Amino acid sequence: MVMTVRVIAPDKTVWDAPAEEVILPSTTGQLGILSNHAPLLTALETGVMRVRQEREWVAIALMGGFAEVENNEVTVLVNAAERGDTIDLETAKREFSEAQAAVAKAAQSGSKQAQIQAAQAFRRARARLQAAGGVVEI
């Protein structure tokens, strides 16, 4: 049994296809969705959503949002999203390294605003790198 999965950002539909399984980065941890899942509405963290079609997994970097599950339909509304197969791995690695350095610099600055912004940029860079297939070492 399959379900319909849609990932919608303000500027585009990132994914609209059937799938057998979905793993979402919810605010309470990873959340697995299979066919006939109970109705659900959940907030999503910045992270990687994984969609399984037959034996293939597709990774999608999500930048926060919400997911609704109902009647074998999973609708994900996000601020921004990118399929992992469209992200350049080398660029993602470089951005992740830069984000790590920015977190360290912000911690030394003592500015709460700088720390929050650096942490958000770090989460985005980590999600993009993971979706692109990179190994994240912290």
UniProtKB/Swiss-Prot annotation:
Gene3D superfamilies: F0F1 ATP synthase delta/epsilon subunit, N-terminal, Helix hairpin bin. Its main location: membrane. The keyword Ion transport applies. Transmembrane segments: none annotated. GO terms for molecular function: ATP binding; proton-transporting ATP synthase activity, rotational mechanism. It is a peripheral membrane protein. SUPFAM superfamilies: Epsilon subunit of F1F0-ATP synthase N-terminal domain (SSF51344). The keyword Ion transport applies. Keywords: ATP synthesis, CF(1), Hydrogen ion transport, Ion transport, Membrane, Thylakoid, Transport. It comes from the Bacteria. Pfam families: ATP-synt_DE, ATP-synt_DE_N. It is found in: Cellular thylakoid membrane. Belongs to the ATPase epsilon chain family. NCBIfam families: ATP_synt_epsi (TIGR01216), PRK13442.1 (NF009977). F-type ATPases have 2 components, CF(1) - the catalytic core - and CF(0) - the membrane proton channel. CF(1) has five subunits: alpha(3), beta(3), gamma(1), delta(1), epsilon(1). CF(0) has three main subunits: a, b and c. Produces ATP from ADP in the presence of a proton gradient across the membrane. This is ATP synthase epsilon chain. It comes from Synechococcus sp. (strain PCC 6716).
